[in-house]
Curated annotation (Swiss-Prot):
Start-end of Polar residues biased regions: 1-12
Pathway participation: Amino-acid biosynthesis; L-tryptophan biosynthesis; L-tryptophan from chorismate: step 5/5
Function description: The beta subunit is responsible for the synthesis of L-tryptophan from indole and L-serine.
Annotated EC: 4.2.1.20
Pfam families according to UniProt: PALP
Gene: trpB
Modified residues (N6-(pyridoxal phosphate)lysine): K111
Keyword Repressor appears in the UniProt entry: no
SUPFAM superfamilies reported for this sequence: Tryptophan synthase beta subunit-like PLP-dependent enzymes
NCBIfam families recorded: trpB (TIGR00263)
Protein name per UniProt: Tryptophan synthase beta chain
Organism per entry: Synechococcus sp. (strain CC9311)
Lineage of the organism: Bacteria, Bacillati, Cyanobacteriota, Cyanophyceae, Synechococcales
Amino acid sequence: MTSTLPTANTPDPASLMPSVRPEAHGRYGRYGGQYVPETLMPALAELEQAAAEAWKDSAFTTELNRLLKSYVGRATPLYEAERLSAHYRRSDGGPRIWLKREDLNHTGAHKINNALGQALLALRMGKKRIIAETGAGQHGVATATVCARFGLECVVYMGAEDMRRQALNVFRMRLLGATVQAVTAGTATLKDATSEAIRDWVTNVETTHYILGSVAGPHPYPMLVRDFHAVIGNEAREQCKESFGRLPDVLLACVGGGSNAMGLFHPFVQDTSVRLIGVEAAGDGVATGRHAATITEGRVGVLHGAMSLLLQDQDGQVQEAHSISAGLDYPGVGPEHSYLRDIGRAEYGAVTDDEAITALRLVSELEGIIPALETAHAFAWLEMLCPTLPNGSEIVINCSGRGDKDVNTVAEKLGNQL
């Protein structure tokens, strides 16, 4: 396990606390911005204006909340993982572990929170064609789902390697009426799918809305996706008060692009007593070079329209990322995560494929919940975290997705070990 904890010379986060909105031009400190072809600037401005107007429109928020409840199944429960807590209990006690059950959402992950919100925005803007990128397939499934619900044309770009790993989700998208476009360029994974989706958008910007699936990309996407996912943290905040009478000590979530983590973290950013911990994919090990630990090992650069930390070689070229988890297999990260790391407000670490598999099995056997491989990375961090916490600490983990989609991958990895 690899960690990037705040150092002694890190600025006091309270003095640099981000506001509810990014700074001018979509900046989070030095990160973010809009590094896109001129063709897309009007579309980004239109999207930012539409979102600002929508949040002020009670008809929009009422409809969004109605569908989140009746269609998505919110609010998702905050579940006390009693046996998992007991597993990490020491002789002098230990933390109590709670799961924010985003895996119980319609489509099986947090992704539908954002897909639903952006689909409603697309309808407001009169856009009838929707495109999306997907890695693990969950964002693609969520986008295909809301497009079916609203009668919108849907094209999902997915790397050919990810299509192989996530064949079940490919079939689900097609069953929902979406066109799934295989991307064979580069590593045939999420980065390449995102690049193809952006190319499509440049060509068809007048008729098409791009439902970007993470807190990455050009402004206003990092803000927009974060705000639609903030329902996770807003619910968790109230549920913690109901369940144990106060805010949690630690929030824990996996980080690829970082949408599920930001959705949980954002409503707590001002509460400096709450530790925010994101867990990346160390793949075969950070030292091997085959990983997706962007915050742990990355340097500042520009990818997919935003400045953030990226995995780069010595010449500044974006490196290939690797993770057993298709949803974390990305060489970049959302700009707000990079900023929270810089100011010391959030901590980030990385766990290997093997550590994630071990955690997936542990949670499955102890709690009867099979988490997604992405989510399993957050669970794996408990091995490092729990021994360091005082007795009575409260941990909330974002259980961001269920593991049905990953059963074949896990079976290939474990072979005859089960």
